[in-house]
């Protein structure tokens, strides 16, 4: 069985600056792995190369046996990979559950708000009903169902992180990359986020790779 993620000899240079040098590791299916290190050590650059946002200088990155460099961004997602970013991209004028039903901010125009609102009208179709059910299920997995109808502008930083993670699960990824999911979050809530993530991994069998400072 191929690993969920296989990184071999990854190298990334910016001009004459070596940002990532000969990095190799694997993430098996159902495994929870962390890349830990201080600012400037190349964690985010590694993440960006894995998710196809940066073109690597050398090496190989495979997601479930498929070379990332041969895939378009939409094909990478279809291969099973989804990522979050350090700074959440939530629609602050929407509720938590509405955010779960639409793509991240800045990917579409403002009319996406009208689309999100329409999902709650009586004539929504069965496909949209299924997405709504999955959105509530994801909030249950992260133990935040009580926040479903709160505006995201009312959430704390840690709560926003949880909502962003929940939205990333809507596409049913097999490999989830989390960029500093507890950055700036107080200790008790940070531990809650990690515990909820571990429970989610156990329940769904997905693979998770995170980067953090410690």
Q: How would you label these PLM feature ranges?
A:
Residues 51:
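Helix-to-loop junction immediately C-terminal to a conserved catalytic motif
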Residues 172:
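Conserved catalytic motifs of ABC-family nucleotide-binding domains
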Residues 151-155:
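Conserved ABC ATPase signature
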Residues 59-66, 78-79:
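Conserved ABC transporter NBD signature motif
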Residues 36-38:
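The feature captures the beta-strand-to-loop junction immediately N-terminal to the Walker
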Residues 112-147, 195-199:
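Conserved ABC ATPase "signature" region
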Residues 176-180:
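Catalytic Walker B motif of ABC-type/P-loop ATPase nucleotide-binding domains
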């Amino acid at each position: 069985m191929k690993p969920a993620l296989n990184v071999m000899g990854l190298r990334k240079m910016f001009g004459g600056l070596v940002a990532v040098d000969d990095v190799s590791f694997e993430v098996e299916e159902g495994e929870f792995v962390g890349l830990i290190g201080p600012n400037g050590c190349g964690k985010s650059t590694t993440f960006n190369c894995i998710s196809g946002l940066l073109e690597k200088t050398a090496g190989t990155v495979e997601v479930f046996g498929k070379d990332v460099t041969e895939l378009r961004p939409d094909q990478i997602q279809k291969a099973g990979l989804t990522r979050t970013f350090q700074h959440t991209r939530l629609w602050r004028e929407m509720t938590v559950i509405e955010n779960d039903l639409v793509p991240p901010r800045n990917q579409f125009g403002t009319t996406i708000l009208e689309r999100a609102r329409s999902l709650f009208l009586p004539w929504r179709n069965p496909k949209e009903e299924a997405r709504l059910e999955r959105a509530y299920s994801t909030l249950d997995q992260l133990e935040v169902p009580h926040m479903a109808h709160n505006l995201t502008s009312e959430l704390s930083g840690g709560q926003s992180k949880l909502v962003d993670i929940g939205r990333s699960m809507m596409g049913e990824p097999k490999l989830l990359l989390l960029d500093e999911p507890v950055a700036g979050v107080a200790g008790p809530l940070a531990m809650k986020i990690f515990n909820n993530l571990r429970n989610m991994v156990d329940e769904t069998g997905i693979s998770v790779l995170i980067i953090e400072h410690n």
